[in-house]
């Protein structure tokens, strides 16, 4: 089942255990990670970079693949689908595609613009019960 990373990590903190986040690049990696998480009875975060998203034909394809694999492989452990170091535009694509967590990397923007974009994305993500993290930069 796809869940919010925030929900997953709150349970992990309360239970004093860690949750692994593994970036996926193709169907085979995704299958291996999901089956291992199931075998270990461990929640897992599947991370996707923008490059991997392009390689796998877009974020909608990635989301559909992960959801189908969870069903077909009978995965019962919690799974979060996370955009790793995404652009502003990439975050919106993942929101529309059904990801459950996004990471906005606005570190290349001037701080004021980064904060404004982050606030906007936080509002959208929270309204959809999604997890969000952001990178401020230096």
Feature roles, as predicted:
Residues 2, 31, 55-63, 85-93, ...:
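Active-site-adjacent beta->alpha loops and helix N-cap segments on the catalytic face
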Residues 66-74, 118-126, 136:
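Surface-exposed amphipathic alpha-helices with a cationic face
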